[in-house]
Amino acid sequence: MSKRNHWYDYLWVLTALYLALGFFNILFAWLGLLCFFIPLIMASTFGTKSYCNKYCGRGQLFELIGNSWKLSPKRDIPSWIRSHTFRYGFLLFFTTMFVNMLVSTYLVFTHAIYFHKTVSLLWTFDVPWHWAYSGGAQPWVAQFAFGFYSIMLTSSILGIITLLLFKPRSWCVYCPMGTITQLICRWKHRK
């Protein structure tokens, strides 16, 4: 008997579309905030990780690439990556990068620094991305878009690297949003 597909089984299309749209117009990066707020709202409201388990388009995309395209060796992820130390350390690092992006956006808003049309891959490599922005928005709006897209693209690259080395959804083990929603769920159930 085959598995019945639901509408939410195709949310990976939105993730792929989001990543593709950022190549053509960086302002679409603002849509990525949905992937930030929806898991937080769902975890706070329901006290479950249902977003991660059922609705996360990125996890679905990694599953598609790893399983359907057979690009994953399906090895277990090392225990040190699953450890609380690594997960919370990675969350702290990711949060620091997010705050750095917000500070850069604020500095562009206050005209303290110039707006940069680059995407930072793996928080290290600034890649020119000028073709994806033709103007029309306040510089700080575009700066936030470049920064947020950098975070989303970097996390996608990390997810693809880990699916090529381990199981398809290995990224989910150390995903910062997954760690935050897990903390929210624990806090909610302790009340």
Describe each PLM feature range.
Residues M1-K191:
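Non-ligating segments of multi-cofactor redox enzymes
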